[in-house]
Regions:
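Claisen-condensing/thiolase-fold acyl-transfer catalytic domains that form or cleave C-C bonds
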Residues: 2-26, 36, 74, 100-101, ...
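Condensing-enzyme catalytic core mediating Claisen C-C bond formation in acyl metabolism
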Residues: 48-112, 117-120, 154-162, 167-170, ...
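Long, hydrophobic, well-ordered secondary-structure blocks that form the structural core
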Residues: 34-42, 48-49
Length: 232
């Protein structure tokens, strides 16, 4: 067992590490997994549940969920073909209630570097999925990538934006947490791959590298994002 933590980018991080271990011959089967829990995240990073604090429109709700993928050396299954390890990006966002804005620059940087390194374009993927930028971060990411010359409007989704039904559940800017990209990828997207509805996914799980202490001290929130290409 190797414990990993990259905030909410952990699903992509664990998939990339598992892929590298397999490629290096250090295992035959490796499980990449992560999880999150709403109540645990609320108590640690926000407010006690009993406090009943009001939420602003940019707030996100931590997903209670877990996802796992088994990676092996052979079989008629989707393959991890590329891994792009992200860089920490800090654009000075200090609002812990707007983590989509804090993480978006890291997602944009990783996606841009992935395309630059591989020579690929958004059209090479059926779906480009960021982890938990939510409604706010997704909009920022779309605009920033357009400034780099990449139009992703037709095939870009965000796991945090789509995991809840905001009209019915009133979830503000959407979902977040390590389990957010994990359940959407291991459940929804993987089923689409296995049914051959899609052939390629670029998963870019995103994380806000903050602590309870740093937020209370008014420090900025660095972001991180790792990209993993999963293809048939």
């Amino acid at each position: 067992f190797i414990g990993l933590y990259g905030a909410c980018s952990t699903m992509s991080e664990s998939l990339s590490m598992a892929s590298l271990f397999l490629d290096g011959g250090f295992g035959s089967y490796i499980v990449a997994s992560t999880s999150s829990h709403f109540s645990a995240a609320e108590r640690q990073f926000r407010f006690p549940l009993e406090y009943g604090c009001q939420r602003c429109p940019t707030c996100q709700w931590t997903v209670t969920g877990s996802g796992a993928m088994v990676l092996g050396r052979s079989g008629d299954y989707p393959r991890v073909t590329y891994v792009t390890t992200g860089l920490v990006k800090d654009y000075g966002i200090k609002d812990a209630n707007n983590m989509g804005a804090a993480m978006a620059p890291a997602a944009v940087d990783t996606i841009y570097n992935h395309f630059k390194d591989t020579g690929r374009t958004p059209k090479d993927y059926d779906i480009i999925a960021t982890g938990d930028l939510g409604k706010v971060g997704k909009e920022i990411t779309t605009k920033l990538l357009a400034e780099y010359g990449y139009d992703v409007k037709d095939n870009y989704i965000d796991c945090g934006d789509m995991i809840f039904d905001d009209e019915r559940q009133k979830t503000d800017a959407g979902g977040s947490g390590c389990g957010c990209s994990a359940v959407v990828t291991c459940g929804y997207l993987y089923k689409k791959l296995m049914r051959r509805e899609i052939k390629s996914v670029l998963l870019v799980s995103t994380g806000a590298l903050m602590s309870t202490t740093s937020s209370l001290q008014g420090e900025s929130i660095p972001g991180i994002a790792h990209a993993v290409a999963i293809e048939f």
